[in-house]
């Protein structure tokens, strides 16, 4: 089972394995007060993507697509499959620090883990055609 939770919320036993999935440590959170079992920076969006997104909900759909492309590497897939196996045997809580509970990297990871756990395959990427780019500046 996969849950997502903000880093600043209190830890609960029902959280199971608490895994911080942000590249940066949560601002203002003391390490001795953080109850994380693991800090998995390698699965976080790249610095470039994180800065581009800036937690702007208008960029959410594009962020999801770009982040999924970043997750489409052998190393990231291995990490995702490992998380999915753990979630199949117990509860895994993905911990994030963003203020927006609906537009953050943990939401995308939870969707990807649900897809893997359901035995789903990634949809094939469509080839780009001229004028089809949706990148926003």
Language-model segment annotations:
Residues 1-137:
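Residues lining hydrophobic/aromatic ligand-binding pockets adjacent to catalytic sites
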């Amino acid at each position: 089972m996969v849950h997502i939770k903000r880093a600043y919320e209190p830890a609960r036993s029902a959280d199971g394995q608490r895994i911080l999935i942000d590249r940066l440590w949560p601002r203002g959170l003391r390490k001795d007060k953080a109850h994380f079992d693991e800090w998995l920076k390698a699965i976080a969006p790249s610095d470039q993507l994180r800065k581009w997104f800036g937690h702007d909900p208008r960029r959410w759909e594009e962020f999801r697509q770009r982040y999924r492309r970043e997750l489409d590497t052998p190393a990231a897939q291995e990490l995702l499959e490992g998380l999915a196996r753990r979630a199949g045997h117990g509860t895994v809580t993905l911990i994030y620090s963003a203020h927006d509970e609906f537009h953050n990297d943990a939401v995308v990871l939870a969707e990807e883990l649900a897809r893997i756990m359901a035995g789903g395959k990634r949809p094939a990427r469509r080839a780009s055609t001229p004028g089809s780019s949706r990148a926003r500046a």
